Regions:
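Structural signal for hydrophobic/aromatic residues that build the beta-strand cores
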Residues: 1, 188, 208-210, 221, ...
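Switch/connector loops and helix/strand junctions flanking conserved nucleotide-binding motifs
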Residues: 2-8, 247-250, 288-291, 306-308, ...
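Helicase motor interdomain insertion/brace
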Residues: 6-229
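Conserved helicase ATPase core of P-loop NTP-dependent helicases/translocases
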Residues: 207-211, 217-223, 234-282
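Short, acidic/turn-prone active-site loops that include or flank metal/cofactor-
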Residues: 242, 302-307, 328-329
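Conserved RecA-like helicase motor core of SF1/SF2 enzymes
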Residues: 277, 283-319
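Conserved segment of the helicase C-terminal RecA-like domain
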Residues: 311-343
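Double-stranded RNA-binding/processing signature
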Residues: 345-393
Length: 393
């Protein structure tokens, strides 16, 4: 997409200051781009994950109350009728995809835990599994109205499964936390500490935003930073995961919202006044929220597109700020970043070019002006004349 197409789509003209560009540069601070390479070995062993995996992998969809109910309805329906066909299709679909509320929720839970174990480390995975299990057991109690969209039989079925999974609370021993952190987490912590020292050497207070793609990973990573021996007494960590537009809505994974102890507004307010100096966030903090400029923006996960790249980087607007992207050793992800950087440079060069051809826009403006020339308004008391082309609608 070239500049002219963008201008046409937005019905606008892209302009860049020329006369006062050097003065503007004194107040607009582009962050220094950095990258972190980390080696990702095979995931370490997580006790709670192994226990969860052993149960979820042997679940039989035929035991699910939703499937049992559909089979009961199918027996009562008259074969060959539209109702019979509808129930049969619904039953076949849920058995094939294993996507009943309970089974899909547990599969989502398992995948989230596996991703956290690989990305953040076994300690974070063990903590996440235990916390979600505790919340889920409470929510699955038929006497609680937490899973309001679930039927009591589904809650009882889920509770039976959860009670068969043996999980343990995590150890907060410093050695256990350190040893059970991933190489990626260790690289992040090293980066945060270096950035803080560099910022404070200029007598500036340090603040950072870490962008993470998945909501569950945000929660787990923030918890690790709160308790890791190298960060727990150095950083005051908060997290943002957005509001209710969730891919897990009405499933077991929606329980993770109960792990949020502070409101989004409180977290942002604390970040503004310095009560918190590190925020772990989903893309919710890329735009639209009133978050102050910070010293350091770190992409734990690569941005999915150029818009996300530009918006997250735009949070690093302080003088001497940095924008850091994390890459796995040997990956081809650097090529995407290089492509976005080159595209951005080309766009800046185009809209800053004083010799750029704007005749197509000027011709359109002239056509509009010609159409409006015969529209005028005269003020009787003063004799002044106003033309439509000069009025702001």
């Amino acid at each position: 997409m070239n500049t002219r197409t963008i201008e046409s789509n937005l019905d606008s003209i892209i302009r860049s200051p020329r006369r006062h560009r050097s003065e503007l540069a004194l107040f607009v601070h582009r962050p220094v781009f950095k990258h972190i390479m980390y080696y990702q070995p095979e995931p370490l062993f997580s006790t709670n994950l192994a226990s969860l995996l052993s149960i979820v992998n042997v679940l039989d969809i035929e035991d699910d109350p939703y499937v049992i109910n559909l089979r009961h309805q199918l027996k009562k329906a008259t074969r060959g009728t539209a109702d019979y066909h509808r129930i049969d299709q619904k039953l076949s679909k849920v058995i094939q995809k294993r996507n009943s509320f309970t089974h899909k929720g547990l599969q989502d839970f398992l995948r989230a835990a596996q991703d956290i174990c690989a990305d953040v480390g076994p300690w974070a995975a063990d903590w996440f599994i235990y916390q979600v299990m505790e919340k889920a057991r409470h929510a699955a109690n038929p006497y609680n109205n937490i899973m309001s969209t679930w039927k009591n039989k589904e809650k009882e079925y889920l509770l039976t499964i959860l009670n068969s999974i043996i999980v343990s609370p995590v150890s907060f021993c410093e050695v256990d936390i350190t040893e059970d952190s991933s190489e990626k987490a260790k690289a992040l912590i090293e980066c945060l500490l270096k950035e803080k020292v560099e910022t404070e050497s200029h007598d500036d207070p340090y603040s950072a935003i870490i962008f993470v793609q998945r909501r569950d990973a945000v929660i787990a990573l923030a918890e690790l930073l709160k308790h890791h021996p190298l960060t727990k007494d150095v950083f005051r960590v908060g997290f943002l995961i957005g509001s209710s537009d969730s891919a897990y809505r009405h499933s077991m994974m929606d329980i993770t919202r109960n792990l949020v102890k502070e409101s989004q507004d409180d977290t942002i307010a604390d970040f503004k006044i310095g009560e918190k100096n590190v925020i772990v966030s989903t893309s919710v903090a890329e735009e639209g929220l009133d978050i102050q400029a910070c010293c350091s923006v770190i992409r734990w996960d690569l941005p999915p597109n150029m818009a996300s790249w530009a918006q997250s980087r735009g949070r690093a607007r302080k003088k001497r700020s940095t924008f850091t992207v994390m890459f796995e050793e040997g990956s081809k992800q650097k090529e995407d970043i290089a492509k976005w950087e080159n595209l951005e440079r080309e766009m800046v060069a185009l809209y800053s070019d004083p010799s750029r051809d704007l005749s197509h826009i000027q011709d359109e403006e002239q056509d509009i002006s010609d159409d409006d020339n015969d529209m005028e308004f005269q003020v009787a008391s003063t004799g002044s004349v106003w033309f439509a082309s000069l009025l702001v609608q």
